[in-house]
């Protein structure tokens, strides 16, 4: 039996491996899952949110081997023709996706100190996949790549210049794969000329950021050298005065490592609310009058609206605001509160459309008289990674599959 070719997409995190298998002809999802708890005593593998297995071992190689075994049991292993890897940080070396070879692996290692928690995990996944699927072309897709079009005035920190020159300390930005996908979808859905429009895209999830896109290129973004900067997130503080951290260190005796853990794991929505990092939990509590939840959501929205206003100044023209990501796509409350903050831009929300949005669909949520269009457009990072794998992996062969997908 001849199997239709598929693309395996791998995203290795600090303690998990997310994976998807997509058809190579139209990038439809065939199967997806997650190996979680890597590095703990109780790792498990869940497939399609239903089937769950305990894993006997808990490193990346064994977890990926278990994933490969499950794919083989389902008759999918032999269909895999390409593999795409999400890589967190490409530094200044990688501005676009690349086919993986030994040289590329070494270059990724060079920039990995910029994102040690994620890049080394990504590299474990690359190494394991190259062993498990020898001979299959693999592609690295960088979360920072889309933002390599930022100008120096947008990416430099006002620190002594030598730290940028010698250590690479600058703003890089993240969620680039999501932004690339949404930019393409926005042009077709909204009927814009992608080479002549100004967008602000709000990728709102447990990690959250903004990107100002002018004529299809990133010109500003809220995350910085790490994903900590910018918006309030689930457990990350976002922007915080360094002086406040220095004060805490002096007053409490906490170390740099203690403070780093605090701003990344104990802050954000969780820190303010004292209840949860999950926006769904906070929204329920918000409507029930929970003081901490209301404060967390109002502070989240204020920070978001303030950053949107700032990002607008990086555009030549502000045509549309796009909400995406888990919160952006599913929270009518956050969209409503944010747009109400942005009335100064002439944004006029259509409350009925905002509340009636069907899950997984794109929708304009402003009225015809709104000076700036606001819309919800679902992201699909796995599809974007698969498309890059197809574009690069089949390029040398001139395969018709590429033409069918693109």
From Swiss-Prot:
It is an enzyme of class 2 (transferase). GO terms for molecular function: acetate kinase activity; ATP binding; metal ion binding; propionate kinase activity. Pathway: Amino-acid degradation; L-threonine degradation via propanoate pathway; propanoate from L-threonine: step 4/4. GO terms for cellular component: cytosol. Keywords: ATP-binding, Kinase, Magnesium, Metal-binding, Nucleotide-binding, Transferase. GO terms for biological process: acetate metabolic process; L-threonine catabolic process to propionate. Substrate binds at residue 86. Mg(2+) binds at residue 11. Its EC number is 2.7.2.15. It catalyses: propanoate + ATP = propanoyl phosphate + ADP. It comes from the Bacteria. CDD domains: ASKHA_NBD_AcK_PK. The active site is at residue 143. Its cofactor is Mg(2+). Belongs to the acetokinase family. TdcD subfamily. Catalyzes the conversion of propionyl phosphate and ADP to propionate and ATP. HAMAP family: Acetate_kinase (MF_00020), Propion_kin_subfam1 (MF_01881). This is Propionate kinase. It comes from Yersinia enterocolitica serotype O:8 / biotype 1B (strain NCTC 13174 / 8081). The gene is tdcD.
